[in-house]
Each structure stands twice: as structure tokens, then as C-alpha cells.
A protein has these predicted regions:
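Phosphate-rich cofactor/ligand-interacting catalytic cores and adjacent structured alpha/beta frameworks
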Residues: 1, 15, 43
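Active-site glycine-rich loop that binds ribose-phosphate moieties when present
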Residues: 1-12
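Hydrophobic, Leu/Ile/Phe/Ala-enriched alpha-helical segments that form helix-helix packing faces
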Residues: 10-15, 90
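A short helix->loop->beta-strand "cap" motif at the edges of active sites that frequently abuts
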Residues: 15-21
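Glycine-rich, charge-decorated loop segments at or immediately adjacent to ligand/cofactor-binding or catalytic sites
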Residues: 23-25, 29-41
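A conserved mid-domain beta-alpha-beta active-site/ligand-binding segment of alpha/beta enzyme cores
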Residues: 42-106
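C-terminal accessory domains and tails appended to enzymatic cores
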Residues: 77-80, 96-172
């Protein structure tokens, strides 16, 4: 639609150059989610082409499912959360929680986006993402940061934990 950047052209260029592509989505309208089109059209309202009750509103009559197909797809209840999970995994692998954003940053981003007209999936101008209010959004970010921080604190312990368990006679 006219509201969105035409970033799918970049996606197509990456595929032409054999650069692996990756998509994160929740409803199938996210770039790259066309890779699982059959599943999306079966389970997601408005994804199918043609039928009046199930088409997108841009005028193409093609349904909301993205045209582009990624090589790898990650689905999440809230696509933002899938993105945060990928960032959390990278932060763990790099040993640096500063690679993740904070609950305060989440609040600022959502507030700023809302101030400039971002609507929720329900069409509401609210401080929420996919129906999840600010307290939930901030809690998810906080929980992911805590999980990574905790896991990083156990890296050395986990190198030998199973040895100690066997030494004590378990699983023997």
C-alpha cells in the first residue's frame, strides 16, 4: 500500500544475488512470509485471494499474505517478539546483553511510533502492538533480557554440570 516502504524490491535483489533471506512474522503480511503461503491462506483471515470477506483493502484483491518468500521463516505470536528473540539469541552468542534493547527503549519506540500515526493491528491508535499493551511489551523485553543475563552467568557452570551429575551417581 502507499503506507509502506517498497522494501520487497531489496528482498528480491538479495534473492537474485543468492543472499539468504530471513523473515519474522505473525499474520503473513510481513515481507518473506509468502514462503508459507499455503499455511497462511488456510488459517489466517483475509489471506486468501479473491473472496470479498477475505481480501486485503489495498485494491489488489490478492489477500494480505506477502508475495515475497524467504528462505527461512520464524513465526511468532507477535512478530516484534520474534525479532526480540533473535536479538536475544545473538546477544547470548556474543555474550553482550547491551545488544538488546531495554524496556524503557521499548516504551519510547512504541510511544514515538504511535505519536506519528502507527496503528495497532486492530486499527487503533494506542500504545500497543498486536493488542498487547505497554506493560506486556515492556515485561517481554525485560524477561528476555533477564533470560540472556542469567544464561550468560551460567556459561562456565554448564560446561561441567553433567559431569558432576554422573559423578554423584545419577544416570549411571
Amino acid at each position: 500500500t502507499s503506507f509502506e516502504a517498497k522494501a520487497d524490491a531489496l528482498f528480491d535483489m538479495a534473492k537474485e544475488r543468492k543472499i539468504p533471506t530471513f523473515a519474522i512474522g505473525d499474520l503473513g503480511n510481513e515481507m518473506g512470509m509468502g514462503a508459507i503461503r499455503e499455511h497462511i491462506e488456510k488459517y489466517i483471515p483475509y489471506a486468501q485471494k479473491g473472496a470479498d470477506h477475505s481480501t486485503c483493502r489495498c485494491g489488489c484483491n490478492g489477500g494480505i499474505c506477502a508475495r515475497t518468500a524467504a528462505d527461512t521463516v520464524l513465526t511468532a505470536t507477535v512478530s516484534d517478539w520474534g525479532t526480540y528473540a533473535v536479538c536475544a539469541a545473538i546477544a547470548f552468542l556474543k555474550g553482550d546483553t547491551d545488544l538488546m534493547h531495554t524496556p524503557e527503549m521499548e516504551k519510547e519506540v512504541v510511544t514515538t511510533a504511535s505519536r506519528y500515526g502507527m496503528i495497532d493491528m486492530y486499527g487503533w491508535l494506542v500504545l500497543a502492538i498486536d493488542g498487547m499493551d505497554m506493560s506486556i511489551l515492556m515485561a517481554i523485553v525485560s524477561l528476555m533480557r533477564s533470560c540472556v543475563s542469567n544464561a550468560l552467568g551460567l556459561v562456565d557452570t554448564c560446561k561441567t554440570w553433567f559431569d558432576k551429575t554422573i559423578e554423584l551417581g545419577y544416570f549411571g
